[in-house]
């Protein structure tokens, strides 16, 4: 017998343009019907023209019953209960992000189960708690993130102090702070006989900008380019370190008789 798992679904309908995850329930010649995993009792339809780009000879070569699919909501008609979906309109970045979001949410549901077992709370009550968290934070995982970084106190008014403390404990054990990266590259030149050594010396000045909790990588791209990558807990810190590192390097190369400039790369 399959073990029952806690799955908390949203009521209502998805919004037009929303990226959703679903399970293919039926595949017909003209399209596929998809059960929306995040919504209670909602099913959408992917017309054959929205399955993939180009002409499709056999839809079953692209989608199969039981398959997980990431879709974009094209249109919603609550009166008729219709939800039009597209698979082809979802790009690779959206697909990856949605899958990760879903995996995170499934983990969060499991964490609620663990707390429920510890505090002797049944699935029905856990579902109510989960829906409260979804209403406040949009997802249960986001609520756990809040507990990890802000403390149990922020959740206590929603789920009670005892439950909030358990959430914070699990969150701190399992959720690590997200790191951010900023990058760019130097173009450094020196016509001196020991020009390469002078450039290396100038680049080492970048490390003097480092502060606690920040990491920096310097990479040779190809003369005269040298990439710098700064990683920190937040963009403000990363930007400040990158700015200081840039100033240090450009000042040093000039002092050593060379020339240089810095070009910022998009995040």
From Swiss-Prot:
GO molecular function, one term: RNA binding
Keyword RNA-binding assigned: yes
Superkingdom of this protein's organism: Archaea
PROSITE patterns recorded: S1
UniProt entry keywords in alphabetical sequence: Initiation factor, Protein biosynthesis, RNA-binding
RNA-binding among keywords: yes
SMART domains for the chain: S1
InterPro entries per record: NA-bd_OB-fold (IPR012340), S1_domain (IPR003029), S1_IF2_alpha (IPR044126), TIF2_asu_arc (IPR022964), TIF2_asu_C (IPR024055), TIF2_asu_middle_sf (IPR024054), TIF_2_asu (IPR011488)
Domain S1 motif: 17-88
Assembly with partners or alone: Heterotrimer composed of an alpha, a beta and a gamma chain.
Family the UniProt entry places it in: Belongs to the eIF-2-alpha family.
Summary of the function given for this chain in its UniProt record: eIF-2 functions in the early steps of protein synthesis by forming a ternary complex with GTP and initiator tRNA.
The protein, known as: Translation initiation factor 2 subunit alpha
Taxonomic source organism: Archaeoglobus fulgidus (strain ATCC 49558 / DSM 4304 / JCM 9628 / NBRC 100126 / VC-16)
Gene: eif2a
